[in-house]
A protein has these predicted regions:
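Active-site helix of classical SDR
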Residues: 101, 137
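Residue(s) in the substrate-gating loop at a strand-loop-helix junction
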Residues: 121
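Substrate-binding pocket helix/loop in short-chain dehydrogenase/reductase
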Residues: 29, 77-78, 85-87
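Active-site-adjacent segment of SDR/Rossmann-fold oxidoreductases
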Residues: 126, 142, 147-157, 198-200
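The beta1-alpha1 cofactor-binding region of Rossmann-like NAD(H)/NADP(H)-dependent oxidoreductases
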Residues: 19, 40-51, 83
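C-terminal helical subdomain
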Residues: 161, 179-269
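A glycine-rich helix->loop->beta "capping" turn
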Residues: 32-35, 55-68, 74-77, 113, ...
């Protein structure tokens, strides 16, 4: 393996920083017989991210896999959260992932090969009290993944997302110790390896933790055509259970599926 390890080495809230965190992982990789380089740049700095990617290109000539896993936490209920804390979490998780993707993208297009893994979260997929900033950023990564997978298809660039549950510095204060003991980080690794492999799927959201693996989907129900008119709001309220009924739901192949479904129903109702 040839791995460039990026870690700002800061606290969980993003403050501070040291190159020691990345170097520790590099030392472990080298001890196992791999090649590795350390990088302590902040993923919120696009110029630094471009330099990081160039560091890998200079060393090994190409970048085959990108795993976006940089993250911080600044948890508070939304009512008590400052917008500075909201923005910083979004900048690290979402813009950091976008910057890294943007920096590797031309290299992957040129070599007609790439595998990108976004680290999303159950908080982004389903919500979690006190994590509005984190949840917004993590679900935004899924939207980025969906579109990049479509745009990358013709270049053999597969883009997926992984929602891990693992005991890390970021989660150790959120769960009791017996739960943390069950959530060994290495239990998530198989999911990441599958998504980064040459035979990886694309536009897939895998969930992993404690040895269990699931898939998450964003679906679209069959829906109900009610037309246009002053009576529609009341009709929608009455038939909302029918609209939200999941029987026959689909996993759209792109965002166009929603509009296609709606226009088809309108044409049929004529």
């Amino acid at each position: 393996a040839k791995v460039l390890v990026n870690d700002l080495g800061g606290a969980v809230d993003g403050s501070g920083g040291t190159a020691g965190a990345a170097q520790k992982v590099v030392d472990e990789i080298r001890a196992a017989g791999g090649e590795a380089l350390a990088n302590a740049a902040s993923v919120t700095d696009f110029a630094a991210v471009e330099a990081m990617v160039q560091q890998a290109i200079d060393a090994w000539g190409r970048v085959d896999v990108l795993v976006n896993n940089a993250g911080i936490l600044r948890d508070k209920s939304f009512a008590k959260m400052s917008m500075d804390d909201f923005r910083l979490v979004v900048d690290v998780h979402l813009m950091g992932a976008a910057y890294c993707c943007k920096a590797v993208w031309p290299h992957m297009v040129a070599q007609q090969y790439g595998r990108i893994v976004m680290t999303t979260s159950s908080t982004g997929l389903y919500g979690n009290f006190g994590q509005s900033n984190y949840g917004a950023a993590k679900l935004a990564q899924v939207g980025l993944m969906q579109t990049l997978a479509l745009e990358g298809a013709k270049h053999n660039i597969h883009v997926n997302a992984l929602a891990p549950t693992a005991a890390t510095r970021m989660t150790e204060g959120l769960m009791p110790q017996e739960v943390l003991d069950a959530l060994k980080p290495e239990a998530v690794v198989p999911a990441m390896l599958v998504l980064a492999h040459e035979s990886a799927p694309t536009r897939t959201i895998l969930c992993a933790g404690a040895g269990t693996f699931e898939a998450a989907h964003i679906t679209l129900t069959q829906g109900v055509h009610l037309g246009i008119g002053s009576e529609v709001p009341e009709q929608l309220a009455v038939r909302l259970a029918e609209v939200t009924n999941r029987a026959g739901e689909q996993v759209p192949q792109s965002g166009a599926a929603q509009g296609t479904n709606e226009v088809a129903k309108a044409m049929t109702a004529r």
